[in-house]
Amino acid sequence: MHIAFVLMGAFGHVNPTLPIAAEMVKRGIRISYFTTEPFRKKVEATGAAFYPVTSRMASAKADPGADMMAGLPAVFLDEADGMIEEILEVLKKDRPDAVVHDFASMAGTLAAASLKVPDIEIFQSYPSSPVLSNAAPFLTVPDTHPARVKAAALAKKFTEKYHAKYLSVKEIFDGFGDFNVVTMQKRFVPGAETFDSNVVFTGVQIGERDSNIDWKFPENGLPLIYFSLGTVFNSW
Protein backbone atom coordinates (compact mmCIF):
# COMPACT_ATOMS: atom_id res chain seq x y z
CA MET A 1 0.00 0.00 0.00
CA HIS A 2 1.16 3.51 -0.82
CA ILE A 3 -0.20 6.60 0.97
CA ALA A 4 0.64 10.22 0.10
CA PHE A 5 0.71 12.90 2.80
CA VAL A 6 0.33 16.52 1.66
CA LEU A 7 0.78 19.13 4.40
CA MET A 8 1.50 22.83 4.32
CA GLY A 9 4.88 23.73 5.83
CA ALA A 10 3.86 24.75 9.33
CA PHE A 11 4.67 23.03 12.63
CA GLY A 12 1.07 22.80 13.81
CA HIS A 13 0.08 21.08 10.57
CA VAL A 14 3.06 18.76 10.11
CA ASN A 15 4.00 17.68 13.65
CA PRO A 16 0.73 15.88 14.56
CA THR A 17 0.98 13.76 11.41
CA LEU A 18 4.53 12.50 11.98
CA PRO A 19 3.72 9.82 14.61
CA ILE A 20 0.94 8.57 12.32
CA ALA A 21 3.28 8.39 9.34
CA ALA A 22 5.92 6.62 11.47
CA GLU A 23 3.41 4.02 12.69
CA MET A 24 2.18 3.39 9.16
CA VAL A 25 5.75 2.83 7.98
CA LYS A 26 6.28 0.34 10.82
CA ARG A 27 3.23 -1.54 9.57
CA GLY A 28 4.70 -1.87 6.10
CA ILE A 29 2.87 0.99 4.40
CA ARG A 30 4.92 3.09 1.99
CA ILE A 31 4.57 6.83 2.63
CA SER A 32 5.33 9.69 0.23
CA TYR A 33 5.30 12.94 2.21
CA PHE A 34 4.99 16.33 0.49
CA THR A 35 5.78 19.48 2.45
CA THR A 36 8.38 22.27 2.54
CA GLU A 37 12.14 21.78 2.80
CA PRO A 38 12.57 22.80 6.49
CA PHE A 39 10.67 19.65 7.52
CA ARG A 40 12.86 17.22 5.57
CA LYS A 41 14.70 15.75 8.58
CA LYS A 42 11.53 15.35 10.64
CA VAL A 43 9.74 13.58 7.81
CA GLU A 44 12.64 11.34 6.83
CA ALA A 45 13.01 10.29 10.48
CA THR A 46 9.58 8.61 10.21
CA GLY A 47 10.78 6.42 7.35
CA ALA A 48 8.66 8.27 4.80
CA ALA A 49 10.00 9.39 1.43
CA PHE A 50 10.26 13.19 1.51
CA TYR A 51 9.27 15.37 -1.45
CA PRO A 52 9.86 19.15 -1.16
CA VAL A 53 7.22 21.48 -2.55
CA THR A 54 7.14 25.16 -3.38
CA SER A 55 5.44 27.42 -0.85
CA ARG A 56 4.11 30.73 -2.08
CA MET A 57 3.03 31.52 1.45
CA ALA A 58 6.56 31.11 2.82
CA SER A 59 8.32 32.91 -0.03
CA ALA A 60 5.93 35.86 0.10
CA LYS A 61 5.74 35.83 3.90
CA ALA A 62 1.99 35.89 3.38
CA ASP A 63 0.15 37.41 6.32
CA PRO A 64 -3.52 38.38 6.02
CA GLY A 65 -3.01 40.61 9.07
CA ALA A 66 -6.04 42.35 10.52
CA ASP A 67 -8.05 41.29 7.48
CA MET A 68 -7.40 37.60 8.16
CA MET A 69 -11.07 36.60 8.04
CA ALA A 70 -11.28 37.92 4.50
CA GLY A 71 -7.89 36.86 3.20
CA LEU A 72 -7.08 33.47 4.70
CA PRO A 73 -9.18 31.33 2.30
CA ALA A 74 -7.40 32.91 -0.67
CA VAL A 75 -4.01 32.38 0.99
CA PHE A 76 -4.72 28.66 1.45
CA LEU A 77 -6.07 28.25 -2.08
CA ASP A 78 -3.12 30.12 -3.57
CA GLU A 79 -0.75 27.89 -1.61
CA ALA A 80 -2.41 24.83 -3.15
CA ASP A 81 -2.18 26.39 -6.60
CA GLY A 82 1.57 26.84 -6.20
CA MET A 83 2.37 23.22 -5.36
CA ILE A 84 -0.28 20.96 -6.90
CA GLU A 85 1.49 20.44 -10.24
CA GLU A 86 4.73 19.44 -8.47
CA ILE A 87 2.79 16.89 -6.44
CA LEU A 88 0.92 15.46 -9.41
CA GLU A 89 4.13 15.16 -11.41
CA VAL A 90 5.31 12.63 -8.81
CA LEU A 91 2.03 10.90 -8.01
CA LYS A 92 0.91 10.33 -11.59
CA LYS A 93 4.03 8.18 -12.00
CA ASP A 94 3.73 6.58 -8.55
CA ARG A 95 0.01 6.42 -7.87
CA PRO A 96 -1.02 6.35 -4.18
CA ASP A 97 -3.92 4.40 -2.72
CA ALA A 98 -5.09 7.51 -0.82
CA VAL A 99 -4.04 11.08 -0.03
CA VAL A 100 -3.86 12.44 3.53
CA HIS A 101 -4.10 16.20 4.15
CA ASP A 102 -5.66 18.74 6.50
CA PHE A 103 -8.12 21.58 5.91
CA ALA A 104 -5.42 24.11 5.04
CA SER A 105 -3.48 21.78 2.74
CA MET A 106 -5.88 21.78 -0.15
CA ALA A 107 -3.30 20.58 -2.64
CA GLY A 108 -4.05 17.21 -1.05
CA THR A 109 -7.74 17.59 -1.85
CA LEU A 110 -6.87 18.44 -5.44
CA ALA A 111 -4.42 15.55 -5.80
CA ALA A 112 -6.97 13.02 -4.53
CA ALA A 113 -9.64 14.37 -6.86
CA SER A 114 -7.36 14.43 -9.89
CA LEU A 115 -6.07 10.90 -9.25
CA LYS A 116 -9.53 9.62 -8.25
CA VAL A 117 -8.29 8.10 -4.99
CA PRO A 118 -9.76 8.42 -1.46
CA ASP A 119 -9.38 11.78 0.24
CA ILE A 120 -8.37 11.37 3.92
CA GLU A 121 -8.62 14.53 5.99
CA ILE A 122 -6.75 14.85 9.28
CA PHE A 123 -7.97 17.23 11.97
CA GLN A 124 -5.36 18.50 14.43
CA SER A 125 -8.06 20.50 16.18
CA TYR A 126 -11.85 20.59 16.46
CA PRO A 127 -13.77 19.38 13.39
CA SER A 128 -16.99 21.19 12.58
CA SER A 129 -20.27 19.63 13.68
CA PRO A 130 -23.94 20.63 13.96
CA VAL A 131 -23.01 22.53 17.14
CA LEU A 132 -19.69 24.02 16.00
CA SER A 133 -18.87 25.71 12.69
CA ASN A 134 -15.24 26.64 12.07
CA ALA A 135 -16.39 28.50 8.98
CA ALA A 136 -18.84 30.78 10.78
CA PRO A 137 -16.45 33.69 11.52
CA PHE A 138 -15.19 33.63 7.92
CA LEU A 139 -18.69 33.71 6.44
CA THR A 140 -19.25 37.24 7.77
CA VAL A 141 -17.11 38.61 4.92
CA PRO A 142 -19.06 39.52 1.76
CA ASP A 143 -18.36 37.64 -1.47
CA THR A 144 -17.57 40.96 -3.14
CA HIS A 145 -14.44 41.47 -1.03
CA PRO A 146 -11.38 41.36 -3.37
CA ALA A 147 -9.81 38.47 -1.44
CA ARG A 148 -13.03 36.47 -1.72
CA VAL A 149 -13.28 37.18 -5.45
CA LYS A 150 -9.75 35.77 -5.81
CA ALA A 151 -10.64 32.74 -3.68
CA ALA A 152 -13.75 32.05 -5.76
CA ALA A 153 -11.77 32.25 -9.00
CA LEU A 154 -9.21 29.74 -7.70
CA ALA A 155 -11.94 27.39 -6.45
CA LYS A 156 -13.61 27.50 -9.87
CA LYS A 157 -10.29 26.81 -11.58
CA PHE A 158 -9.65 23.80 -9.33
CA THR A 159 -13.09 22.33 -10.01
CA GLU A 160 -12.60 22.64 -13.76
CA LYS A 161 -8.96 21.53 -13.92
CA TYR A 162 -8.74 18.85 -11.22
CA HIS A 163 -12.41 17.80 -10.95
CA ALA A 164 -12.32 18.71 -7.26
CA LYS A 165 -15.34 19.63 -5.17
CA TYR A 166 -15.94 23.37 -5.11
CA LEU A 167 -13.75 24.73 -2.32
CA SER A 168 -16.04 27.41 -0.98
CA VAL A 169 -15.19 29.13 2.30
CA LYS A 170 -17.66 26.86 4.09
CA GLU A 171 -16.19 23.75 2.44
CA ILE A 172 -12.65 24.74 3.41
CA PHE A 173 -13.41 25.16 7.11
CA ASP A 174 -16.43 22.89 7.65
CA GLY A 175 -15.82 20.18 5.06
CA PHE A 176 -14.74 16.55 5.50
CA GLY A 177 -12.85 14.01 3.43
CA ASP A 178 -13.97 10.55 2.36
CA PHE A 179 -12.42 9.35 5.62
CA ASN A 180 -11.42 11.56 8.56
CA VAL A 181 -8.94 11.27 11.42
CA VAL A 182 -9.27 13.54 14.47
CA THR A 183 -6.17 13.70 16.67
CA MET A 184 -8.16 14.57 19.79
CA GLN A 185 -10.05 12.57 22.37
CA LYS A 186 -13.67 12.17 21.32
CA ARG A 187 -15.03 13.41 24.65
CA PHE A 188 -13.44 16.83 24.09
CA VAL A 189 -15.06 17.39 20.67
CA PRO A 190 -18.41 19.26 20.61
CA GLY A 191 -21.03 17.29 18.69
CA ALA A 192 -18.82 14.20 18.41
CA GLU A 193 -21.84 11.94 18.85
CA THR A 194 -23.21 13.19 15.51
CA PHE A 195 -20.34 11.79 13.42
CA ASP A 196 -20.66 8.52 11.56
CA SER A 197 -18.12 5.76 10.99
CA ASN A 198 -16.03 7.76 8.52
CA VAL A 199 -14.71 9.87 11.42
CA VAL A 200 -12.28 8.26 13.87
CA PHE A 201 -10.68 9.73 16.99
CA THR A 202 -7.07 8.71 17.65
CA GLY A 203 -6.30 10.94 20.61
CA VAL A 204 -3.25 13.19 20.71
CA GLN A 205 -0.32 11.96 18.62
CA ILE A 206 2.97 12.50 20.46
CA GLY A 207 6.09 11.30 18.72
CA GLU A 208 9.78 11.52 19.48
CA ARG A 209 11.09 15.08 19.60
CA ASP A 210 14.58 16.05 18.49
CA SER A 211 14.58 19.44 20.21
CA ASN A 212 16.99 20.06 23.08
CA ILE A 213 14.88 21.65 25.79
CA ASP A 214 16.47 22.48 29.13
CA TRP A 215 13.20 23.40 30.86
CA LYS A 216 12.30 21.28 33.89
CA PHE A 217 9.14 20.87 35.93
CA PRO A 218 9.20 23.18 38.97
CA GLU A 219 9.60 21.22 42.18
CA ASN A 220 7.22 23.29 44.28
CA GLY A 221 4.34 20.84 44.55
CA LEU A 222 1.87 23.22 42.90
CA PRO A 223 -0.46 22.20 40.05
CA LEU A 224 0.98 22.99 36.63
CA ILE A 225 -1.00 24.33 33.68
CA TYR A 226 0.60 24.28 30.23
CA PHE A 227 -0.50 26.78 27.56
CA SER A 228 0.58 26.26 23.95
CA LEU A 229 0.24 29.26 21.66
CA GLY A 230 1.05 27.09 18.67
CA THR A 231 1.98 28.43 15.26
CA VAL A 232 -0.48 31.33 15.35
CA PHE A 233 1.96 33.36 17.45
CA ASN A 234 5.14 32.01 15.90
CA SER A 235 5.00 32.98 12.22
CA TRP A 236 3.40 29.68 11.21
Language-model segments: which ranges?
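A short, glycine/small-residue-rich beta-strand->loop->alpha-helix junction that serves as a flexible
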Residues: 6-18, 233-236
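Short amphipathic alpha-helix
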Residues: 14-27, 39
